[in-house]
């Protein structure tokens, strides 16, 4: 085995959750408040950050929420949607093989660490991962520092021996 440290994203890599959760969450939140999402909603939200998207939905759909309460409700909606998410084919077998070969693995995700733990536990694969890093703020996945932190915490120092 060439790579000794493995850094996985959860959504879209290990779990089939991109469409169900991340594309479906705004629709589900709007329906919770009796609103009908417009057909162009996904395209409209695509280039917005979380805060800008929240402001847009509150304003355009007249939601009776503050930004703070919006994010609280959105966490609930996302948690409910994650209950339907399944593993992608072959994931369990691959993780077991990597573990048997002595690989150290972690999760680096934009999803809240607590939510990741819940999903990974429900799917029976949490035991494969040493830790979960929330890629937010300074440690965002668009910056290599988050991956260097993960590699270091996995006991690695050589990026060539680490798979992302």
Predicted regions and their residues:
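Active-site neighborhood of HAD-like aspartate-dependent phosphohydrolases
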Residues: 1-43
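Helix-loop "lid/cap" segments that line or gate small-molecule binding pockets
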Residues: 26-30, 49-64, 119, 150-151
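Short helix-capping segments at alpha-helix termini
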Residues: 31-36, 61-65, 124-128, 155-156
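Hydrophobic "anchor" residues on beta-strands that sit immediately upstream
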Residues: 5-7, 106, 163
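Metal-dependent phosphoesterase signature
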Residues: 37, 56-93
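Hydrophobic alpha-helical segments typical of transmembrane helices
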Residues: 24-25, 41, 53, 57, ...
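Short, acidic loop-to-helix structural element flanking the phosphoryl-transfer center
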Residues: 2, 79-107, 113, 117, ...
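Substrate-recognition "cap/lid" segment bordering the active-site pocket of phosphatases
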Residues: 84, 112-163
């Amino acid at each position: 085995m060439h790579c000794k440290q493995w850094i996985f994203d959860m959504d879209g890599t290990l779990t089939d959750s991109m469409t169900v959760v991340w594309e479906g969450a705004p629709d589900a939140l709007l329906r919770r408040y009796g609103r009908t999402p417009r057909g162009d909603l996904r395209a409209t939200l695509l280039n917005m950050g979380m805060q800008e998207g929240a402001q847009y939905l509150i304003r355009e759909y007249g939601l009776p929420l503050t930004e703070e309460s919006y994010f609280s409700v959105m966490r609930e909606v996302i948690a409910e949607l994650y209950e339907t998410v399944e593993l992608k084919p072959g994931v369990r077998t691959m993780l077991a093989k990597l573990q048997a070969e002595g690989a150290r693995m972690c999760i680096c995700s934009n999803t809240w660490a607590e939510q990741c733990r819940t999903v990974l536990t429900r799917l029976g694969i949490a035991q494969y991962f040493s830790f979960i890093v929330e890629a937010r703020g300074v440690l965002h996945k668009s910056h290599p520092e988050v991956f260097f932190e993960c590699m270091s915490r996995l006991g690695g120092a050589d990026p060539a021996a680490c798979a992302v």
